[in-house]
Amino acid sequence: HTITHTEEPGRVSIAKGQGDDTIIRTIETNRLYGGLSERIETVRGINDAEPVACNRSVRQYTDGGWLLVSETEAFNTPLARTTSYEYNSQYRVSRINRPDGGYTRYEYDGEGRVTLEAEPWAGGGEQVTRTEYAGLRFYDNRPARVAEFRVLSDGTEIELTAAAYAYERSPLMERVTKTVTAAGSGQEQTSVEETYGEAAAYPYAAGQTKFTRDIAGVETFYDYEAAVEHGAAHKKTAVTKVGGELAAGQSRKTESFLAANDTVLVEQESIWDGENWLLLSSGAHEYDEEGRRTKTTRGNGRVSATSWMCCGKLSETDEDGILTSYGYNSAHQLVETIRSEISDGDTVITPETITTYTRDAAGRVLQTRRDRGAMTTTESVEYDRLGRIVRQTDVLGRVTATAYSENGLTETVTTPAGATLVTERHPDGSVLHEYGTGQRERCHVYDIDHNCLRETVTLAGQAIILSRTLVNGFGQNVVQVTPTTAGFLYDRSEYDEQGRLIRAWRDAGTQEGAVAMTP
């Protein structure tokens, strides 16, 4: 592979590859007025009339050093989109302004830690995350409480979720307990993680995970010791339990034998049957000098292997003996995969499959061709200067075109049949409006109801409700409302503290017709 590096005053060019594969990356730097400096980076193929990517960044020198002022994608084109940055008196980012009208603003405490992060919300205000810090040691960046709010347009703040962290520390162990509460739910979700301290009995274990308990109550205990088998340096054992006890048919033990560089040489998994550990699976692994796995031998004798080159995988053979080979061009891009024929005696089950990729200088796939036996299919994709898909052609030659508004929030898809589907979004990604050929025009409205996030879908004019969904702070769907000829049906859901659905029922605004569901 060839890489050529050329330098001129204020300009660096790096050419990668040979012949038609060559990709040229150019970086220009220029001094501007007012202590500003610009950096323009372009990427193009050797045969491209125009770059496939051109980005510009502007920095300003201040008492706080060089600060990023703006970044522009698709620079010097009609599609150019600029993100700008604002800073506070301490030279920390206070606001990021995005080209779609969105933004992120930050507030800091006296030690420079982020205490507030806010972005616009489709409900009319902001979605805000506030962070308080533990302060148990010097410059303690560990959170004590992280809360997510929705700030309504009238300034009212509604807390949706709050995660509280408790810390314990000793020479033998460090423990973090996380307790999450959420609006619209009376449950608490608690998880625990412990790590071995610096005085761990086995020095290698220091800083390693000792114990975890997830919100479902599943506990995993980790143990480390010196290994005396398989040429390993360390042995790691992980055992799952519930309430500190082994559960028949559920508890599992995973034993990993580790080399000095932490690669797994041998691993085996067992399940507890109530009296003994029964082996489920095992495997021995081999690696090359760069630590990449080259061979795995399972306990049942089945073998898989992988060979590597500088670009990535050269070939791999799975446990069924199926060989997949990979081909790269001189610019290190994957351009071909060949999957060997699968046969049963003289009967061909799946013929050899060759997949060929045509890529642009940015590495994006422009065309995919698949040759499977005597059958050939081709599909292609076109992108704009911002890297967005604007045209897709499927294997049957059908074309789907996509157009975007200037701010990128409206997407118009034209199907192969000529129909148009238009989707308008809020800067936070939420769908606001959907309409097009042959479909009902729908509006999405977001707000807060009963301390839950509510999404209401209506027909145009917002007089007729199609659906209404309430989601609590845990992200659990608690009520789904659908209209009927006589009114509305309410599908309600109830969850336990482990996040499992335990009860669901339907009513017309009453509590009748409950249907219990087992966890």
Please identify what each model-predicted range represents.
Residues 1-519:
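Beta-strand elements of repeat-based all-beta scaffolds
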